[in-house]
Structures are given as structure tokens and as C-alpha cells.
């Protein structure tokens, strides 16, 4: 009798080194066979700033598509690639206040700037998910959530900055962590704000024939 095949053995490549996205996929029983760190230029292009609300959507879409294309190229270049024809999943999350896309905070100064802009305001989080099937078919979805921060005092901001939780996070905060104490309202997908909208991701995978969901 063959041993039970674990639900985690999935022919899927995650084009992201984000532990948050890997953890979210695991939540719905999907653990990638391979993860790839896809380093691409995340600088907004001139054509991505035409209309209010369009900036972060276009930026998120371009970056997610770029990550997917990079993953394809890397897999083709690796002669010893462990998977001949996997599904590829790429995603990119952009946090924006109005037309202004916030950075992935890497310094305390960037984190402080983000928190100052977010404090007492509503902002939007866009994640584009791109899935490529083994036969080359593509599907994508852009998901939007709205988040409202309570007004943070200077002392609260400094305490959060001291935690270091913001480092590498889009918009300089993690809703699944200490920042939850300052989230007054959320409209839309919670997992989208963490980094991967699970319902929409599962729909994309199912639609392209991913059999583990």
C-alpha cells in the first residue's frame, strides 16, 4: 500500500521569497515545491501615474507580471530544475495613500514616514496575483482592500518602530502583528493586506486546473 501523499506536495513554484505568502498558501493546504526570489526593479514608471487610483494598481500589476516572467526565465535557465512543468504563482502588494505608493520600509526613517502618512487615515492595499499553468495559460486578478488606521501618537509610532516589525513590509506595517492594535476598520480581504488574497488566489489556481484545491 502506497503511503498517503501529503497535501503539501504541490507542483507549484512561488515566485516570491516572502515568508508571509508561503505561510498564507500553507493555510489553504498549498506548499510550493520551490520558491524563487525574483529581484526586479520596483521603481514606478512614468506611465503608471495618469489617474487617481490607477497608480498603485498599475504598479502592482507590472511588478507581479515581472516576477512571473522572471520565474519563467530562471526555471528555463536552470538545467537541473526540479520541476519540468510547474504552475507558477507570483504576486505583488502595493500600499497607497491617495495616489502615493508607500515603500517597503527598510529604514526607521521610511517606517516613520509611512506611519505618519497612515495615522488617522484610510489607505488602500492592492495585490495582483498572476498564475501561469504548465501549458503557458495565464490568469491574473487585482484585489483591493481599504484599511483605516487610528490616529497614532508619537510615542506609539516610536514604540512600533522600535519593534522592528515594519522592516521589509509594504507600507511599513504588518496587520497580522502588533499593528493590529491600530487598525480601526478593514474593508475587503484581510489576507490581501497580509500579502496574498487567498480566496481569489484559490479561484485562479482552480480555474487553471490546479488539482490540489
Curated annotation (Swiss-Prot):
Q: Which InterPro entries match?
A: ITPase-like_fam, Maf-like
Q: Which reaction does it catalyse?
A: dTTP + H2O = dTMP + diphosphate + H(+); UTP + H2O = UMP + diphosphate + H(+)
* Cellular component terms per the entry's GO annotation: cytoplasm
At which residues is there a site annotated Important for substrate specificity? 20, 93, 176
The active site lies at 92 (proton acceptor)
* One Gene Ontology term of the molecular function aspect: UTP diphosphatase activity
Q: What does this protein do?
A: Nucleoside triphosphate pyrophosphatase that hydrolyzes dTTP and UTP. May have a dual role in cell division arrest and in preventing the incorporation of modified nucleotides into cellular nucleic acids.
Family membership: Belongs to the Maf family. YhdE subfamily.
The protein depicted here goes by the name dTTP/UTP pyrophosphatase
Which organism does this sequence originate in? Granulibacter bethesdensis (strain ATCC BAA-1260 / CGDNIH1)
